[in-house]
Amino acid sequence: MAKAKFERTKPHVNVGTIGHVDHGKTTLTAALTKIGAERFGGEFKAYDAIDAAPEEKARGITISTAHVEYESPTRHYAHVDCPGHADYVKNMITGAAQMDGAILVCSAADGPMPQTREHILLSRQVGVPHIVVFLNKADMVDDAELLELVEMEVRELLSKYDFPGDDTPIIHGSARLALDGDQSDIGVPAILKLVEALDSFIPEPTRDVDRPFLMPVEDVFSISGRGTVVTGRIERGIIKVGDEIEIVGIRDTQKTTVTGVEMFRKLLDQGQAGDNAGLLLRGTKRDDVERGQVLCKPGSIKPHTEFEAEVYVLSKDEGGRHTPFFKGYRPQFYFRTTDITGACQLPEGVEMVMPGDNVKMVVTLINPVAMDEGLRFAIREGGRTVGAGVVAKIIK
């Protein structure tokens, strides 16, 4: 059969497998690529190829992640699978592989285990919007009542962390049988049912270009006779000449109008997400804008100083701290383009945090930063990255 050419016409959705060690995440990933390749195009990736995930660096943190792709009738999926629990924690906190939805793999024989819970909690903290469940190893459970019991436990766990437990699709199956081509209900058909659930339950993500305009300020220039130009990479949305924008963060919010959009020293009518652009601002002085602020669509993002975060602290081997830190720790928090000092408040009963740990903390910054829940940041000490985090909840 001729190899199907990759068509960009299908919408692209990012997913990944989460769940306890040895519950079958990688086997399921292999089964998805195999059945996807047979039915809808794409290429089969064997278990061993996925399991030998290469190490990559994201923000100075070493993470092993396997990336595979498969198709459904209507979509193209990019799927991440991590070999170890620590890789999941790092991956989710750094946002190295952003997920529009996750496939929670839970063994029907064992039921929910500690990492099942931890991955659901992490998904909530880092803003994974949707979870679909695959109850794996269903061939090892003869008792239908036991299956129902495990399903109930998983639903309760999802609800506990504010996912819609009662409405979540839960598919029973065996990834191993499906890989072997088994045609019984829990074999290949279960994988097809899972793909259907992904298609229907995980909404298509809003493309960056369709979201409200935002550009982090990287540099500010004053051009005589023309005014102030602010440069940066447009993170989301579209900006046109004549648009009103706000300058948010660090100091009081100001309003201004964009009178010019430049790229590669050419004047354009508009810039969009992904472009490196220079924006000419009307009546704005060079000292009114600084690195660390953002330009945005008015009202679309607010400045905040206090938030709850989920943080991964780099291990010594990753170039992080060699010693733990305690409450009252005051490092710099690097948001988008700048460092802002902040104080850390640790959870009750946590006296210290060791390199290599992940922890929930409340951070109070000395200056406000434009932020939404889900924004990633680095923790630095004198320019050296010692941690990575994500804004889980804004307090004020």
Curated annotation (Swiss-Prot):
<keyword id="KW-0648">Protein biosynthesis</keyword>
<dbReference type="InterPro" id="IPR005225">
    <property type="entry name" value="Small_GTP-bd"/>
</dbReference>
<dbReference type="Pfam" id="PF00009">
    <property type="entry name" value="GTP_EFTU"/>
</dbReference>
<keyword id="KW-0547">Nucleotide-binding</keyword>
<dbReference type="GO" id="GO:0005829">
    <property type="term" value="C:cytosol"/>
</dbReference>
<keyword id="KW-0963">Cytoplasm</keyword>
<dbReference type="InterPro" id="IPR004161">
    <property type="entry name" value="EFTu-like_2"/>
</dbReference>
<dbReference type="InterPro" id="IPR033720">
    <property type="entry name" value="EFTU_2"/>
</dbReference>
<feature type="region of interest" description="G1">
    <location>
        <begin position="19"/>
        <end position="26"/>
    </location>
</feature>
<feature type="binding site">
    <location>
        <position position="26"/>
    </location>
    <ligand>
        <name>Mg(2+)</name>
    </ligand>
</feature>
<keyword id="KW-0342">GTP-binding</keyword>
<feature type="binding site">
    <location>
        <begin position="19"/>
        <end position="26"/>
    </location>
    <ligand>
        <name>GTP</name>
    </ligand>
</feature>
<dbReference type="GO" id="GO:0003746">
    <property type="term" value="F:translation elongation factor activity"/>
</dbReference>
<dbReference type="InterPro" id="IPR009000">
    <property type="entry name" value="Transl_B-barrel_sf"/>
</dbReference>
<dbReference type="GO" id="GO:0003924">
    <property type="term" value="F:GTPase activity"/>
</dbReference>
<dbReference type="GO" id="GO:0097216">
    <property type="term" value="F:guanosine tetraphosphate binding"/>
</dbReference>
<feature type="binding site">
    <location>
        <begin position="81"/>
        <end position="85"/>
    </location>
    <ligand>
        <name>GTP</name>
    </ligand>
</feature>
<dbReference type="InterPro" id="IPR009001">
    <property type="entry name" value="Transl_elong_EF1A/Init_IF2_C"/>
</dbReference>
<dbReference type="InterPro" id="IPR004541">
    <property type="entry name" value="Transl_elong_EFTu/EF1A_bac/org"/>
</dbReference>
<dbReference type="InterPro" id="IPR050055">
    <property type="entry name" value="EF-Tu_GTPase"/>
</dbReference>
<keyword id="KW-0479">Metal-binding</keyword>
<feature type="binding site">
    <location>
        <begin position="136"/>
        <end position="139"/>
    </location>
    <ligand>
        <name>GTP</name>
    </ligand>
</feature>
<dbReference type="InterPro" id="IPR031157">
    <property type="entry name" value="G_TR_CS"/>
</dbReference>
<comment type="subunit">
    <text>Monomer.</text>
</comment>
<feature type="region of interest" description="G4">
    <location>
        <begin position="136"/>
        <end position="139"/>
    </location>
</feature>
<feature type="region of interest" description="G5">
    <location>
        <begin position="174"/>
        <end position="176"/>
    </location>
</feature>
<comment type="function">
    <text>GTP hydrolase that promotes the GTP-dependent binding of aminoacyl-tRNA to the A-site of ribosomes during protein biosynthesis.</text>
</comment>
<keyword id="KW-0251">Elongation factor</keyword>
<dbReference type="InterPro" id="IPR004160">
    <property type="entry name" value="Transl_elong_EFTu/EF1A_C"/>
</dbReference>
<dbReference type="Pfam" id="PF03144">
    <property type="entry name" value="GTP_EFTU_D2"/>
</dbReference>
<comment type="similarity">
    <text>Belongs to the TRAFAC class translation factor GTPase superfamily. Classic translation factor GTPase family. EF-Tu/EF-1A subfamily.</text>
</comment>
<dbReference type="InterPro" id="IPR041709">
    <property type="entry name" value="EF-Tu_GTP-bd"/>
</dbReference>
<feature type="domain" description="tr-type G">
    <location>
        <begin position="10"/>
        <end position="206"/>
    </location>
</feature>
<protein>
    <recommendedName>
        <fullName>Elongation factor Tu</fullName>
        <ecNumber>3.6.5.3</ecNumber>
    </recommendedName>
</protein>
<feature type="region of interest" description="G3">
    <location>
        <begin position="81"/>
        <end position="84"/>
    </location>
</feature>
<keyword id="KW-0378">Hydrolase</keyword>
<dbReference type="InterPro" id="IPR000795">
    <property type="entry name" value="T_Tr_GTP-bd_dom"/>
</dbReference>
<feature type="region of interest" description="G2">
    <location>
        <begin position="60"/>
        <end position="64"/>
    </location>
</feature>
<dbReference type="InterPro" id="IPR027417">
    <property type="entry name" value="P-loop_NTPase"/>
</dbReference>
<dbReference type="Pfam" id="PF03143">
    <property type="entry name" value="GTP_EFTU_D3"/>
</dbReference>
<keyword id="KW-0460">Magnesium</keyword>
<dbReference type="GO" id="GO:0005525">
    <property type="term" value="F:GTP binding"/>
</dbReference>
